[in-house]
């Protein structure tokens, strides 16, 4: 078979399969009639969302508001934090406020607590006693000490998932007259602006590393080819500090595989576990925005349609059931990363999936595989979720939502809930019902910049009011460290020539607090210490005025 000429122009690996393809009754999302949410659907989704929200709210660490990696119904300490779970949790708090599960004030207080904890932890290249380095966070944290747990890696993808939650709360809590919401926006901005995006880039191939350890350096793995790292590249290209160039997107997409599967006749960009098709869409609306790597799949083809096809392919595999599991079928399906019945001789936690070069299937189904795809294909997801809840009852479902996974062939039901599996269920259900998360994220310049610089055009990107910001010229390299700080911080700046300088400190309301300098200084680097111990915590600004211009620097004082 001759490969189309347009394919040769794209850095894609197009796999033409010789499988016998099963005919499918399938419609692209723009062809299918809009799904009408019935009263019964609304009742079911209300309960599912509320119960899943309860897990994030009730199981968060009490002293920090940060979310654990996993828990059981009866877990109480919940101090082992997953920063990816925190990203879903921050977003969940906004959904809870919008749905009335908690008040907006309660949600804002919880978010403020969590952001302050993330800022309070120490950032350095030390191996112990630190929360992260260069603005990136360790995969797992001990909430009691706000430091690295289990010798985990400084994780690129998990930091990105957390940052999406930070972006969400920066834009959701938008009341300019509310001091608490203003503090949330300020804290979120500091967290976002200090991520050194270029730090994780492999200088040899433009790819983003899977992570870094102080003991051994960068992990020997870069994200390349379609998976959940789409969100990581969009943030890194659109970020504030040392963003990656557009060429990084070209490197990432050069590993794409486009193919059909044995049981699904429609080609799509494959990644076997469904979570890779879900995480980016939980926050970003990819409907109607296009990129050149998608042209070969059709004029209207977008990443939303790609995720819909992946969902249908996953279900089609389970219906075909080549391994003859006793329960697979039209309403019992869903393969992605999840726990498993390891004690029964099966796999434990593993990235299961049903498309791409490797099928991983040991009979273990997880509700998040279907639930995280509800926005793409509610017509097949809602019947599956209802069926699993009704059939297995309290063995699989509780007032914290669905437990992580089950394997009917050995009568195994997980006792754990996992944050990164709970999150897609809650966020995607909200996007189906109100598009709250998507619409909130569209307000942020990091998201808009990242998409536009990666080459996305069309749809809502053409009408957004968010314009790419021009970075200010840092005439004096005004800065301070540490930032955030506890009582004392050192303010630094540089002068190109001898000149008059005034350096003042202002609080968040614009009132001058003190004058640190009002004199003539020689050219060169300068620094001075500022003691804020007698002032209330919060946001402060240093303002440097000279004969050559003005520059300001935001500083965050925490205790």
Give the label of every model feature segment.
Residues 2-3, 213, 245, 531:
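Short, solvent-exposed coil/turn linker segments
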Residues 19-23:
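Sec/Tat signal peptide C-region and signal peptidase I cleavage site
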Residues 1-10:
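Bacterial N-terminal signal peptides that target proteins for export
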Residues 10-18:
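Bacterial N-terminal signal peptides
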Residues 462-468:
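Short, compositionally biased serine/threonine- and acidic-rich segments at solvent-exposed termini, linkers
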Residues 4, 469-559:
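C-terminal outer-membrane/trafficking sorting elements
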Residues 24-462:
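Ser/Thr/Asn(+Pro)-rich, low-complexity disordered segments
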